[in-house]
Protein backbone atom coordinates (compact mmCIF):
# COMPACT_ATOMS: atom_id res chain seq x y z
CA UNK A 1 0.00 0.00 0.00
CA UNK A 2 1.45 3.36 -1.02
CA UNK A 3 1.66 6.18 1.46
CA UNK A 4 -0.23 9.37 0.63
CA UNK A 5 1.86 12.44 -0.07
CA UNK A 6 1.21 15.27 2.36
CA UNK A 7 2.08 17.80 -0.35
CA UNK A 8 -0.39 16.20 -2.80
CA UNK A 9 -3.09 16.16 -0.13
CA UNK A 10 -2.46 19.86 0.59
CA UNK A 11 -2.77 20.63 -3.14
CA UNK A 12 -6.00 18.64 -3.33
CA UNK A 13 -7.44 20.50 -0.34
CA UNK A 14 -6.47 23.86 -1.89
CA UNK A 15 -8.02 22.83 -5.24
CA UNK A 16 -11.18 21.56 -3.53
CA UNK A 17 -11.50 24.84 -1.61
CA UNK A 18 -11.20 26.86 -4.82
CA UNK A 19 -13.73 24.65 -6.63
CA UNK A 20 -16.20 24.82 -3.73
CA UNK A 21 -15.85 28.62 -3.63
CA UNK A 22 -16.71 28.73 -7.35
CA UNK A 23 -19.77 26.51 -6.80
CA UNK A 24 -18.57 23.02 -7.74
CA UNK A 25 -20.78 20.05 -6.97
CA UNK A 26 -19.50 17.08 -4.97
CA UNK A 27 -19.19 14.82 -8.05
CA UNK A 28 -16.79 17.30 -9.66
CA UNK A 29 -14.71 17.49 -6.48
CA UNK A 30 -14.49 13.69 -6.31
CA UNK A 31 -13.40 13.50 -9.92
CA UNK A 32 -10.74 16.23 -9.75
CA UNK A 33 -9.17 15.48 -6.35
CA UNK A 34 -7.96 12.39 -4.51
CA UNK A 35 -9.72 13.36 -1.29
CA UNK A 36 -12.27 11.00 0.23
CA UNK A 37 -15.97 11.73 -0.08
CA UNK A 38 -16.20 12.22 3.69
CA UNK A 39 -13.40 14.81 3.74
CA UNK A 40 -14.93 16.65 0.78
CA UNK A 41 -18.34 16.80 2.48
CA UNK A 42 -16.70 18.07 5.68
CA UNK A 43 -14.74 20.70 3.73
CA UNK A 44 -17.88 21.72 1.81
CA UNK A 45 -19.85 22.18 5.05
CA UNK A 46 -17.03 24.19 6.59
CA UNK A 47 -16.77 26.56 3.61
CA UNK A 48 -20.44 26.86 2.66
CA UNK A 49 -22.13 26.31 6.01
CA UNK A 50 -24.40 23.64 4.56
CA UNK A 51 -24.03 20.16 3.08
CA UNK A 52 -23.44 19.84 -0.67
CA UNK A 53 -26.54 19.62 -2.87
CA UNK A 54 -27.71 16.12 -3.72
CA UNK A 55 -28.76 14.81 -7.08
CA UNK A 56 -27.35 13.86 -10.43
CA UNK A 57 -25.13 16.05 -12.55
CA UNK A 58 -26.50 17.47 -15.80
CA UNK A 59 -25.85 14.92 -18.51
CA UNK A 60 -27.67 16.20 -21.59
CA UNK A 61 -25.99 18.14 -24.37
CA UNK A 62 -29.34 19.77 -25.21
CA UNK A 63 -29.02 22.41 -22.47
CA UNK A 64 -26.05 23.91 -24.32
CA UNK A 65 -28.04 24.25 -27.56
CA UNK A 66 -30.72 26.69 -26.38
CA UNK A 67 -29.96 30.21 -27.54
CA UNK A 68 -28.95 32.05 -24.35
CA UNK A 69 -27.17 29.09 -22.77
CA UNK A 70 -25.32 28.52 -26.05
CA UNK A 71 -23.90 32.05 -26.02
CA UNK A 72 -22.66 31.67 -22.43
CA UNK A 73 -21.29 28.16 -22.98
CA UNK A 74 -19.55 29.30 -26.17
CA UNK A 75 -17.91 32.23 -24.37
CA UNK A 76 -16.57 29.90 -21.69
CA UNK A 77 -15.46 27.24 -24.19
CA UNK A 78 -13.58 29.76 -26.34
CA UNK A 79 -11.67 30.99 -23.26
CA UNK A 80 -10.93 27.40 -22.20
CA UNK A 81 -9.63 26.41 -25.63
CA UNK A 82 -7.52 29.58 -25.84
CA UNK A 83 -5.85 28.72 -22.53
CA UNK A 84 -5.16 25.17 -23.73
CA UNK A 85 -3.81 26.21 -27.15
CA UNK A 86 -1.47 28.83 -25.71
CA UNK A 87 -0.16 26.36 -23.14
CA UNK A 88 -0.86 28.73 -20.26
CA UNK A 89 -2.48 25.92 -18.28
CA UNK A 90 -4.21 22.57 -18.68
CA UNK A 91 -6.62 20.20 -16.98
CA UNK A 92 -8.80 21.53 -14.20
CA UNK A 93 -6.62 24.66 -13.92
CA UNK A 94 -7.69 25.65 -17.44
CA UNK A 95 -11.34 25.08 -16.51
CA UNK A 96 -10.98 27.26 -13.39
CA UNK A 97 -9.19 30.09 -15.21
CA UNK A 98 -11.62 30.01 -18.15
CA UNK A 99 -14.54 30.07 -15.72
CA UNK A 100 -13.08 33.07 -13.89
CA UNK A 101 -12.71 34.85 -17.27
CA UNK A 102 -16.33 33.98 -18.07
CA UNK A 103 -17.48 35.42 -14.71
CA UNK A 104 -15.53 38.63 -15.36
CA UNK A 105 -17.29 39.12 -18.70
CA UNK A 106 -20.83 38.17 -17.64
CA UNK A 107 -22.42 40.17 -14.86
CA UNK A 108 -24.15 37.78 -12.48
CA UNK A 109 -27.87 37.82 -11.87
CA UNK A 110 -29.15 37.53 -8.30
CA UNK A 111 -29.64 33.79 -8.75
CA UNK A 112 -26.03 33.34 -9.89
CA UNK A 113 -24.36 32.95 -13.27
CA UNK A 114 -26.26 31.29 -16.10
CA UNK A 115 -23.39 28.85 -16.62
CA UNK A 116 -22.47 27.23 -13.29
CA UNK A 117 -18.98 25.81 -12.78
CA UNK A 118 -20.17 22.20 -12.72
CA UNK A 119 -22.06 22.71 -15.98
CA UNK A 120 -18.96 24.34 -17.52
CA UNK A 121 -16.91 21.33 -16.39
CA UNK A 122 -19.52 19.02 -17.93
CA UNK A 123 -19.27 21.02 -21.17
CA UNK A 124 -15.51 20.43 -21.21
CA UNK A 125 -16.10 16.70 -20.79
CA UNK A 126 -18.64 16.73 -23.66
CA UNK A 127 -16.17 18.57 -25.93
CA UNK A 128 -13.29 16.26 -24.98
CA UNK A 129 -15.42 13.17 -25.64
CA UNK A 130 -16.52 14.47 -29.05
CA UNK A 131 -20.23 14.99 -28.26
CA UNK A 132 -19.99 18.77 -28.73
CA UNK A 133 -17.64 21.03 -30.65
CA UNK A 134 -17.03 24.66 -31.50
CA UNK A 135 -18.30 25.55 -34.98
CA UNK A 136 -17.81 28.79 -36.86
CA UNK A 137 -20.91 30.90 -37.57
CA UNK A 138 -21.29 31.47 -41.31
CA UNK A 139 -22.53 35.05 -40.66
CA UNK A 140 -20.25 36.57 -38.00
CA UNK A 141 -17.39 34.05 -37.93
CA UNK A 142 -17.60 33.54 -34.16
CA UNK A 143 -17.10 30.08 -32.69
CA UNK A 144 -20.13 28.59 -30.97
CA UNK A 145 -20.98 25.28 -29.31
CA UNK A 146 -22.77 22.85 -31.65
CA UNK A 147 -23.40 19.13 -31.72
CA UNK A 148 -20.45 17.16 -33.03
CA UNK A 149 -19.99 16.83 -36.78
CA UNK A 150 -21.87 20.02 -37.65
CA UNK A 151 -21.38 20.45 -41.42
CA UNK A 152 -18.92 23.26 -42.17
CA UNK A 153 -20.60 26.49 -43.29
CA UNK A 154 -24.10 25.39 -42.26
CA UNK A 155 -24.29 27.01 -38.83
CA UNK A 156 -25.68 30.45 -37.94
CA UNK A 157 -25.40 31.45 -34.29
CA UNK A 158 -28.30 32.67 -32.17
CA UNK A 159 -26.84 36.19 -32.13
CA UNK A 160 -27.04 36.45 -35.93
CA UNK A 161 -30.37 34.63 -36.14
CA UNK A 162 -32.08 34.98 -32.76
CA UNK A 163 -35.12 32.77 -32.17
CA UNK A 164 -38.49 34.53 -32.22
CA UNK A 165 -38.89 34.23 -28.45
CA UNK A 166 -35.65 36.18 -28.00
CA UNK A 167 -37.00 39.04 -30.08
CA UNK A 168 -40.25 39.06 -28.09
CA UNK A 169 -38.25 39.55 -24.89
CA UNK A 170 -37.18 42.97 -26.08
CA UNK A 171 -37.92 44.82 -29.27
CA UNK A 172 -34.73 45.11 -31.25
CA UNK A 173 -34.00 48.02 -33.51
CA UNK A 174 -31.52 48.10 -36.36
CA UNK A 175 -29.13 49.99 -34.09
CA UNK A 176 -28.39 48.24 -30.76
CA UNK A 177 -27.72 51.63 -29.12
CA UNK A 178 -31.42 52.48 -29.66
CA UNK A 179 -32.76 49.62 -27.54
CA UNK A 180 -32.65 51.47 -24.19
CA UNK A 181 -34.27 54.69 -25.51
CA UNK A 182 -37.00 52.57 -27.16
CA UNK A 183 -37.77 50.89 -23.84
CA UNK A 184 -37.89 54.26 -22.08
CA UNK A 185 -40.27 55.62 -24.73
CA UNK A 186 -42.56 52.58 -24.29
CA UNK A 187 -42.60 53.08 -20.52
CA UNK A 188 -43.48 56.78 -20.94
CA UNK A 189 -46.37 55.96 -23.29
CA UNK A 190 -47.72 53.34 -20.86
CA UNK A 191 -47.51 55.79 -17.96
CA UNK A 192 -49.53 58.45 -19.80
From Swiss-Prot:
GO BP terms: bacterial-type flagellum organization; DNA-templated transcription; positive regulation of bacterial-type flagellum assembly; positive regulation of DNA-templated transcription
Signals that turn on the gene: Expression is regulated by a large number of systems, including induction by quorum sensing via the two-component regulatory system QseB/QseC, induction by cAMP-CRP, repression by high osmolarity via OmpR and repression by H-NS.
Cofactor binding remark: Binds 1 zinc ion per subunit.
Binding sites annotated in the UniProt record for Zn(2+): 137, 140, 157, 160
Keyword Transmembrane attributed: no
InterPro entries reported for this sequence: FlhC
MF terms (GO), sorted A to Z: DNA binding; zinc ion binding
Cited SUPFAM superfamilies: FlhC-like (SSF160930)
Localization in the cell: Cytoplasm
PTM-bearing positions, type O-UMP-serine: 31
GO cellular component: cytoplasm; transcription regulator complex
Cofactor(s) recorded in Swiss-Prot or TrEMBL: Zn(2+)
Keyword Endoplasmic reticulum applies: no
Regulation: UMPylation of FlhC by SelO/YdiU inhibits its DNA-binding activity, which inhibits the expression of class II and class III flagellar genes, and interrupts flagellar synthesis.
Entry PTM: Can be UMPylated on Ser-31 by SelO/YdiU.
Superkingdom of source: Bacteria
Keywords: Activator, Bacterial flagellum biogenesis, Cytoplasm, DNA-binding, Metal-binding, Nucleotide-binding, Phosphoprotein, Transcription, Transcription regulation, Zinc
Family classification: Belongs to the FlhC family.
Its job: Functions in complex with FlhD as a master transcriptional regulator that regulates transcription of several flagellar and non-flagellar operons by binding to their promoter region. Activates expression of class 2 flagellar genes, including fliA, which is a flagellum-specific sigma factor that turns on the class 3 genes. Also regulates genes whose products function in a variety of physiological pathways.
Subunit structure of this chain's protein: Heterohexamer composed of two FlhC and four FlhD subunits. Each FlhC binds a FlhD dimer, forming a heterotrimer, and a hexamer assembles by dimerization of two heterotrimers.
UniProt name for this protein: Flagellar transcriptional regulator FlhC
Organism in which the protein naturally occurs: Escherichia coli (strain K12)
Amino acid sequence: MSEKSIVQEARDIQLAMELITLGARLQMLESETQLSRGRLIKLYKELRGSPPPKGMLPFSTDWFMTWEQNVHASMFCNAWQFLLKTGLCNGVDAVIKAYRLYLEQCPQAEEGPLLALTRAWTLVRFVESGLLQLSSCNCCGGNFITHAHQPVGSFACSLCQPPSRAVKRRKLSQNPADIIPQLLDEQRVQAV
